[in-house]
Amino acid sequence: VELCEDLWTPNPPSISHALAGASVLVNLSASNELTGKDSYRRELVSGQSARLLAAYIYASAGEGESTQDLVFSGHNIIAENGQILAESKRFGHGILYSEIDVERLCAQRRRMTTFVTEDQTHTEILFSLKIEETKLTRFIDPAPFVPTDRQNREKRCDEILMIQAMGLKKRLEHTGANAVVGISGGLDSTLALLVTVRAFDLCGRDHKGITAVTMPGFGTTDRT
């Protein structure tokens, strides 16, 4: 067993567990939700299961987690030797399960001689290196959070909207209050209204519980 951010460290405890013979590794996590984090999380789990020739079960906290300014999606993943066997839908409910072929994993480890003979010590080799100025050729995206592909962009926007709406939904359920949103005409207040509507939909509440107050300012125009 390892806990949450253990998986994100340079030397996760699961490495020692696998070298000691563990074939099923479990991560009890409380990973908050951020834009694009689900893909990175999925790659970590899949990669670690492949590297260690093991099954990796990742169980993250859901919306029942006590929180103030974080949102938890309940993202659960079961991977076996690099293959995702099962994955839950974020912000969903229910139990995730799958069959794990432990005997197959053990057989693969027996064939992988380097896994058995792996030495946990390291060797230092000193060498000289001449530092030269190198021209950078890597493309740096000026808008890294906005996918160029329309389908991925729409998915990203919906993800952002859902993360914010789930946070507000939890607060609305806790207080039982209605919502008052100030509308200045800018993008921020427009997004706030859209998030509020989505949160009310998730709660199954009537939109009449939302009061939008126009707050025109010096930048307000007919287009606004």
Which residues are covered by each model-predicted region?
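Short acidic (Asp/Glu) and glycine-rich catalytic loops that position anionic groups and cofactors
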Residues: L25-L28, D141-V146, E173, A177, ...
